[in-house]
């Protein structure tokens, strides 16, 4: 724990995947007595879950397009964002700038490098993202969620720290809860989500796949499924036709409570999703998003699948028959599902936010406690304010 209060800037792209771990770190740094500010884009400033104490500064940020016009526009926006970030740093005086990926993080990190402010990047996925690849050689430390990170230059291993993906405190609080009782006579609770926007492929496949289960499993089903608004009535009709009780919605406020009571999760393989599943210890059938950059969702599944805590099905092979086959293999015998839950739990890194905060605190003014390098063998394989 530090003995001085410092200022930190978190820079993150405007999606939940980048911002959820940033919000978690903000809460931890605030708890330790520090002042924290967020730099993001207009989307990011509106993402639900931002702590009330955290001001969000909106900076221009452009993508580096392939055609000359798009490239010029992107570079101009990045340069403008860099200049605005430098003005913010003059008044806020951060001890460190922490990037969580996404193009909106780029201007602030470039500004920090120019101002000789220490920088840390956090990679949520098992593939180093584009912006983090651009910055990896320049930053002072690279925090990773996985022990194997593709597209990470082996020459940079010396500044890599495996910390994991920070998860929300309300989810982390479930880590000590036992896996829900699952016997040959109990309910079989299945939770299905497709990320922040739902996933139509899950709406198309899951109801029919569950209907193909043996009667001993099918008759015990209790399903909760997140759907896109346009899919709700069609999915409702499918479950009704199969006589499977299902609660459907576009968003569930009490998702952590539903996760606590779940026996099996079916959904995408985003980094935050897997971090929460392994923090709580819930077995899963994961369907990686096929258009994810660098196929990073498929890479995210490697560790938990190898451990026996989940099964992965490529979307091209995600059929009702294949889903039913995989569910039956996991849940036909109660001990099999319980073993998978334990394997998932063992993959969790519950101290991720603490370890990331310790790493961040190792840069800037002293005295502070030494940060422990967690894994030196990582392999390469709204308080919104518009800056003037």
UniProtKB/Swiss-Prot annotation:
Keyword GTP-binding: no
Pathway the protein acts in: Cell wall biogenesis; peptidoglycan biosynthesis
Cell location: Cell inner membrane
Catalytic activity annotation: di-trans,octa-cis-undecaprenyl diphospho-N-acetyl-alpha-D-muramoyl-L-alanyl-D-glutamyl-meso-2,6-diaminopimeloyl-D-alanyl-D-alanine + UDP-N-acetyl-alpha-D-glucosamine = di-trans,octa-cis-undecaprenyl diphospho-[N-acetyl-alpha-D-glucosaminyl-(1->4)]-N-acetyl-alpha-D-muramoyl-L-alanyl-D-glutamyl-meso-2,6-diaminopimeloyl-D-alanyl-D-alanine + UDP + H(+)
InterPro entries: GlcNAc_MurG, Glyco_trans_28_C, GlycoTrans_28_N
Keywords in alphabetical order: Cell cycle, Cell division, Cell inner membrane, Cell membrane, Cell shape, Cell wall biogenesis/degradation, Glycosyltransferase, Membrane, Peptidoglycan synthesis, Transferase
GO terms of biological process kind: carbohydrate metabolic process; cell division; cell wall organization; lipid glycosylation; peptidoglycan biosynthetic process; regulation of cell shape
EC code(s) of this entry: 2.4.1.227
UniProt key word Glycosyltransferase: yes
Annotated membrane topology: Peripheral membrane protein
Pfam family, one: Glyco_transf_28
GO cellular component: plasma membrane
Predominant localisation class: membrane
Source taxon at top rank: Bacteria
One Gene Ontology term of the molecular function aspect: undecaprenyldiphospho-muramoylpentapeptide beta-N-acetylglucosaminyltransferase activity
Binding site for UDP-N-acetyl-alpha-D-glucosamine: 15-17, 125, 168, 196, 297
Similarity comment: Belongs to the glycosyltransferase 28 family. MurG subfamily.
Function of the molecule: Cell wall formation. Catalyzes the transfer of a GlcNAc subunit on undecaprenyl-pyrophosphoryl-MurNAc-pentapeptide (lipid intermediate I) to form undecaprenyl-pyrophosphoryl-MurNAc-(pentapeptide)GlcNAc (lipid intermediate II).
Protein name in the entry: UDP-N-acetylglucosamine--N-acetylmuramyl-(pentapeptide) pyrophosphoryl-undecaprenol N-acetylglucosamine transferase
The organism of origin for this protein: Novosphingobium aromaticivorans (strain ATCC 700278 / DSM 12444 / CCUG 56034 / CIP 105152 / NBRC 16084 / F199)
Gene name of this polypeptide: murG
């Amino acid at each position: 724990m530090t003995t001085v209060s410092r200022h930190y800037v978190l820079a993150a792209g405007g999606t939940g995947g980048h911002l959820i771990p940033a919000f978690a770190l903000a809460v931890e740094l605030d708890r330790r007595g520090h002042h924290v500010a967020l730099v993001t884009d207009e989307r990011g400033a509106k993402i639900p879950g931002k702590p009330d104490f955290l001001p969000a500064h909106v900076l221009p940020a452009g993508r580096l397009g392939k055609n000359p016009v798009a490239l010029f526009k992107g570079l101009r926006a990045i340069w403008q964002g860099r200049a605005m970030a430098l003005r913010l740093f003059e008044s806020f005086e951060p001890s460190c700038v922490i990037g969580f990926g996404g193009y909106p993080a780029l201007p602030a990190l470039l500004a920090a490098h120019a101002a000789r402010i220490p920088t840390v990047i956090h990679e949520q996925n098992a593939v180093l993202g584009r912006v983090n690849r651009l910055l990896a050689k320049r930053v002072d430390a690279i925090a990773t969620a996985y022990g194997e990170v593709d597209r990470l230059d082996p020459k940079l291993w010396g500044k890599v720290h495996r910390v994991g993906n920070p998860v929300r405190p309300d989810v982390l609080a479930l880590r000590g809860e036992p896996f829900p009782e699952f016997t040959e006579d109990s309910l079989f609770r299945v939770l299905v989500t497709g990320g922040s926007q739902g996933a139509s492929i899950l709406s198309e496949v899951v109801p029919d796949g569950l209907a193909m289960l043996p009667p001993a499993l099918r008759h015990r089903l209790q399903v909760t499924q997140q759907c896109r608004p346009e899919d709700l009535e069609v999915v409702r009709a499918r479950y009704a036709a199969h006589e499977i009780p299902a609660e459907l919605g576009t968003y569930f406020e009490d998702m952590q409570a539903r996760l606590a009571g779940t026996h099996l999760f079916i959904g995408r393989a985003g980094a935050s999703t897997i971090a929460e599943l392994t923090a709580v210890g819930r077995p899963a059938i994961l369907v990686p998003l096929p258009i994810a950059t660098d196929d990073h969702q498929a890479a995210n599944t490697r560790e938990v699948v190898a451990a026996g805590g989940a099964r992965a099905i490529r979307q091209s092979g995600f059929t009702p028959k294949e889903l039913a086959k995989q569910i039956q293999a996991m849940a036909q015998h109660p001990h099999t599902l319980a073993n998978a839950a334990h394997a998932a739990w063992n993959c969790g890194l519950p101290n991720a936010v603490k370890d990331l905060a310790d790493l961040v605190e190792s840069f800037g003014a002293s005295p502070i406690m030494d940060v422990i390098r967690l894994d030196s063998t990582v392999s390469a394989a709204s308080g919104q304010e518009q800056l003037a």
